[in-house]
Amino acid sequence: MKILMAEDDFVTRKFMVGFLSKYGECDVTVDGMEAVDAFMMALEDGEPYDLVCLDIMMPVMDGYQALMGIRNLEKDRGIPEDKRAKVIMTTALNDEKNVKMAFELGCTIYSGKPIDKERFEQAMKKLGLIQ
């Protein structure tokens, strides 16, 4: 599995990479702009990401803008919805407004912080990313 993570907090990045790296290659970006750029490069190389983990509150470009950029790249390339990357929002913003916005923009699962490894792994199983 190929994983892209956009997270500006060092401790969270280290934690997430620590448990996600056992499932596959994990690329890390620190803002939404880098995430969209990395996603585009992966598509151009013919090696798209299977899973994208996006924080919402990040510098340069927030997670919502990054999610829109990622979904637009997939749409522009004619990638069918069932073949698109699974996007899990990983954020401390757990209020109804933010959850609703993320799903409207195309996230697959919303996972509030602090991240619970077991729940996160269950979400990945539900998405068919791991056994």
Region locations from a protein language model:
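Conserved acidic carboxylate
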Residues: 7
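Charged docking surfaces used in two-component/phosphorelay signaling
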Residues: 14-21
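Receiver (REC) domain active-site loop signature in two-component systems and cognate sites
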Residues: 58
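Alpha4 helix (beta4-alpha4-beta5 surface) of REC/receiver domains from two-component response regulators
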Residues: 83, 94-109, 122
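Short amphipathic alpha-helix used as the core "switch/output" element in two-component signaling
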Residues: 37, 41, 64-82
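Helix N-cap/capping motif at the beta->alpha junctions
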Residues: 10, 28-41, 63
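Active-site beta3 strand of CheY-like receiver
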Residues: 43-53
